[in-house]
């Protein structure tokens, strides 16, 4: 498994620009632009790339342009949500298994570093009324993923999943610190903490957002999404040396 850097790349914008939660619209990058961007992420020293089946072309493009560098980065994806104009959720065993196998094919890899349950807003029900986590644990035992994670919304679901998972993904930023307590509980258990929406979907400037998140010692990786190599360079510059690797 590749070293895990404090800054990771969230590859949403590489593949999807419909029904996003960002405060601005954007054009999808071309194939050539995607190639340059994704390889630049690794060239800049970022070793964590996160994607999902619901991110449009994201998985396919990562597989196309980074499979030859697979040993250089920690690759996470998700299962449970798909998107074709609208989000659809299916946490059945068959759907989770099919999702992971499809992701492996699109990403052109034999094993994933982590697969997160991609929960909808009723994440307690996803955790307690489906076999999503258990199915991923079975796939982990079969060697298809090294870690199992849960991407959720409520403190209750995150706290309840901790005995089962290796990683969590939660929102945490200057405007939303509700998960701070459960993030620390996760870290105390040795569960990796991945932070999404660290810049509050672009409403908090990077120079304020990045130090705020990374000064929290429970955080493993802050995921950032950008289509600009220059912005990525600036964000890395804002990351103190003591935070480079977690």
What are these regions (language model features)?
Residues 3, 63-74, 104-110, 140, ...:
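Acidic (Asp/Glu)-rich catalytic clusters
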Residues 1-73:
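N-terminal binding-site loop/beta-alpha segment at the start of enzyme catalytic domains
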Residues 43-46, 109-112, 145, 165, ...:
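A structural motif
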Residues 120-246:
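Beta/alpha (TIM)-barrel catalytic core signal, keyed to glycine-rich beta->alpha loops juxtaposed to Asp/Glu
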Residues 104-123:
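Active-site groove signature of glycoside hydrolases
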Residues 14-32, 82-97, 119, 123-125, ...:
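Active-site mouth loops of central-metabolism enzymes
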Residues 9, 41, 49, 62, ...:
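Conserved, mostly hydrophobic/aromatic
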Residues 24-41, 91-108, 151-160, 205-212:
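Short, acidic/polar
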């Amino acid at each position: 498994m590749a070293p895990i850097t404090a800054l990771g790349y969230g590859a949403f914008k590489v593949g999807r620009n419909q029904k996003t939660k960002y405060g601005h619209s954007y054009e999808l990058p071309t194939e050539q632009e995607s190639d340059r961007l994704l390889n630049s992420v690794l060239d800049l020293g970022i070793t964590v790339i996160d994607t999902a089946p619901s991110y449009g072309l994201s998985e396919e493009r990562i597989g196309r342009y980074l499979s030859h560098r697979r040993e250089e980065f920690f690759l996470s994806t998700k299962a449970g949500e798909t998107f074709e104009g609208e989000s659809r959720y299916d946490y059945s065993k068959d759907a989770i298994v099919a999702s992971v196998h499809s992701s492996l094919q699109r990403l052109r890899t034999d094993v994933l570093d982590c697969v997160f349950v991609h929960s909808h807003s009723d994440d307690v029900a996803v955790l307690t009324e489906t076999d999503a986590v258990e199915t991923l644990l079975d796939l982990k035992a079969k060697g298809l993923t090294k870690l199992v994670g849960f991407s959720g919304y409520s403190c209750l679901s995150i706290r309840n999943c901790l005995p089962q998972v290796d990683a969590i993904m939660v929102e945490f930023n200057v405007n939303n610190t509700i998960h701070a307590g459960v993030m620390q509980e996760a870290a105390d258990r040795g569960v990796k903490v991945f932070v999404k929406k660290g810049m509050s979907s672009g409403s908090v400037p990077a120079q304020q957002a990045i130090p705020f998140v990374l000064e929290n010692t429970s955080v493993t990786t802050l995921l950032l999404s950008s289509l600009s190599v220059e912005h990525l360079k600036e964000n890395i510059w804002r990351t103190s040396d003591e935070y480079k690797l977690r």
